[in-house]
Amino acid sequence: MDADYGRVHNQDGKRLDTADWKNALFILTSIMSTAKDGQAVCDAGLKVQSVDSGLPVIFGRNDIAYVNCSDEHGVIEDKQNQLKINDKLHLIPGHCDPTCNLHDWYVCVRDGVVVDLWPVSARGKAW
């Protein structure tokens, strides 16, 4: 489930990403810069994700937000200046289908351990 579907509400009025469904697709990103007060720059921009359905959501963090991106970088609002260089974050892509098409492999992780690699065999195909 991507961030776009996560914003949908179920019959009980709860967001799907906090109720019945769990996220399984993430983009692992690293903090590259904290030079500007209140902001951090990560290495996940448009070349690793599709934002046609909205920007990604930072998994498990309500205190920071992904607010902008360029081709190769993302800007994270960090009002409390908590993030440090090389900190790792998991992004929930705004739209999973075209995000997957930008990658060659799924890296399958269970309990913090890589357990498999799945090729994205249709990557870049337009038929």
Predicted regions and their residues:
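Active-site anion/phosphate-binding pocket segments in diverse small-molecule metabolic enzymes
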Residues: 1-127
